[in-house]
C-alpha cells in the first residue's frame, strides 16, 4: 500500500485567461502545460510565473513540484493567472501566514487578483469609445 501524497489544487483568472495549479511534494520542478518552465521561450513570462517561488525562498522551492495548466486569453494574461494560482497554492500548501504577508507586501494582485476587463465594442463604433468625427460644415 502506498503513502498518500499531499496535493493542493488552486485556480486563478486574469482577463479571459484561466490557470489551475497542482502542488505536491517533489524536487523543485515546475511544468506549465506539461512543458518545463525552463523551456518557455519568453523570459518575461518565465520570470513572472516564477515570482512566487523566488519570493518563497529556496527551502520551499526545492521541496515541491508544481504543474500549471493554462487556457484562454493571451500569453501575458495566462502568465498572470499562472502566477496567481501558484502563489495561492503555495500559501495553502505551506499554511504560512508569513508567506501570505510577503506576497501581499510585494504585490497584492498575487493573491487577490485584478478585476479589470476589456471594455466591449459598441454598436456603430470602431472600438469601445471611438466615434465618427462630427462635421459641422
Curated annotation (Swiss-Prot):
GO terms for molecular function: RNA binding; structural constituent of ribosome. It comes from the Archaea. Keywords: Ribonucleoprotein, Ribosomal protein. GO terms for biological process: maturation of SSU-rRNA from tricistronic rRNA transcript (SSU-rRNA, 5.8S rRNA, LSU-rRNA); translation. GO terms for cellular component: cytosolic small ribosomal subunit. The keyword Heme does not apply. The keyword Nucleotide-binding does not apply. Transmembrane segments: none annotated. It holds the Pfam family Ribosomal_S9. PANTHER family: RIBOSOMAL PROTEIN S16, RIBOSOMAL PROTEIN S9. Belongs to the universal ribosomal protein uS9 family. NCBIfam families: PRK00474.1, uS9_arch. HAMAP family: Ribosomal_uS9_A. This is Small ribosomal subunit protein uS9. It comes from Saccharolobus solfataricus (strain ATCC 35092 / DSM 1617 / JCM 11322 / P2). The gene is rps9.
